[in-house]
Amino acid sequence: QNDGDCPIAVSNVKLTIAAAGASETAEFVPELSDYIVLLPGETGYIARWLGETTIPAGEAITLNASLTAEKRDERGARITVDNLYIADNYPSVTTLSGRLTCQEGRACAANMIFAGFYDENGRFIGAWYFSKNALFEGGDSKNFVVDMNDFPIAKLSEKAADVRGIGFGFDF
């Protein structure tokens, strides 16, 4: 969450994951981070697939995240993400559906959409991001359905009591 008083973009992320005596570190710049500008009070999400790991499967992990943020001018269009619904489909594909609405008076040809998943206690359990191939004029709304292939949380619809989204529209 941007608890400051100016727009920011996350310019670097360092994750340290530890469990069962093993630990791994991943450092990266989030995709399209120059366009993902959080206004004061906004909450954003970062998702990263780490691939092969030395952390034993099924172990409880400890995650330490260090973020570097830089002041940015607000850019692009805000995209409201609402009417979110998760479905676990046969045989094992989870889908996320909802509606995207572009900010009045702004247009965009590209976008990044983020969703955060929370359990019944309001505890954050994971995030997903995607880009929807859609041109928006100011005020346009478009429905979407995306397959969440390889999402690591099985039966997400049973575990996520709340889904929150945020979207960013921009032109290259």
What do the predicted segments below correspond to?
Residues 44, 94-96, 111, 142:
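Hydrophobic core residues within well-ordered beta-strands of beta-rich domains
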Residues 25-55, 125-153:
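Intrinsically disordered, low-complexity Pro/Gly/Ser/Thr-rich segments with frequent PxxP/GP/PP motifs
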Residues 1-7, 100-105:
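Asparagine-centered strand-capping/turn motif at beta-strand->loop junctions
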Residues 7-14, 26-28, 107-114, 126-128:
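Short, hydrophobic/aromatic beta-strand segments
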Residues 51-93, 151-172:
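Terminal connector regions
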Residues 101-116, 121:
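Mature extracytoplasmic domains of secretory-pathway proteins
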